[in-house]
Design a protein with these regions (language model features):
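Active-site rim/loop-helix segments in enzyme catalytic domains that contact anionic ligands
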Residues: 1-103, 131, 138
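Metal-dependent de-N-acetylase/amidase catalytic core
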Residues: 75-82, 86-206
């Protein structure tokens, strides 16, 4: 998990900075009797939760791109004018470029091309994150006066997980399955086949 990776890096004294595209305003609410009562401040609640979680992990720097949560694919939230899914590509990339130049990371991470399980904002993080990785050193597209001094991170890693391992875990959790569910488990629309994963980290101690 990225949480384990962040905790490990922080424990080793590595400076870790997190950039989050949205505050999760369109997320699901499962632990309230009256979800509508907190819906209007869900972004505020989730930001507080994230800051508390990062403090436990030892991460000191958190920045937001300040877009709105786009909701799950195919929901009305996708059409919101302020949703990250609808963000101007160069504008969003520029916001991240400015933060890369501010924090000057050696390694960047972003979601895989399919956004893990297909969330619109995760897909957009892949697009914008990959573009910003290359754009951070590009003064032609992102001039110094507006975005700061150029910087080129050494590595960009796309975060994903083993589809085969995910299938095994899901089958173990669900026990006996019918034929239709078995087919769904065999070809889930998430993760990557193991042969395409080039970097693995064991974060079990964290």
């Amino acid at each position: 998990s990225m949480g384990g990776t962040l905790a490990e890096l922080a424990d080793r004294g590595v400076a870790v900075s997190i950039v989050t595209a949205t505050r999760g305003e369109a997320g699901e609410i499962h632990n309230r009797d009256d979800a509508d009562a907190v819906r209007h401040r869900l972004g505020e609640i989730r930001e507080a939760e994230q800051r508390a979680a990062l403090a436990v992990l030892g991460v000191q720097h958190l920045e937001y791109l300040d877009y709105r949560d786009s909701g799950m694919m195919g929901t009305p939230e996708n059409a919101h004018l302020e949703a990250f899914w609808n963000a101007d590509y160069m504008e969003a990339t520029g916001r991240l470029v400015a933060l890369i130049r501010k924090y000057r990371p050696e390694v960047m991470t972003a979601y895989d091309p399919f956004g893990g399980y297909g969330h619109p904002d995760h897909i957009q993080v892949h697009r914008v994150g990959t573009a910003a990785f290359f754009g951070a050193a590009d003064l032609g597209r992102f001039p110094r006066a507006r975005f700061g001094a150029p910087w080129q991170p050494d590595h960009l890693l796309w975060s994903s997980w083993s589809r085969e391992r995910s299938i095994g875990v899901r089958k173990a959790m669900r026990g006996e399955t019918n034929e239709e569910l078995e087919e769904e488990l065999d070809e889930p629309a998430s993760g990557f086949l193991s042969r395409f994963l080039s970097v693995r980290r064991d974060v079990a101690p964290y």
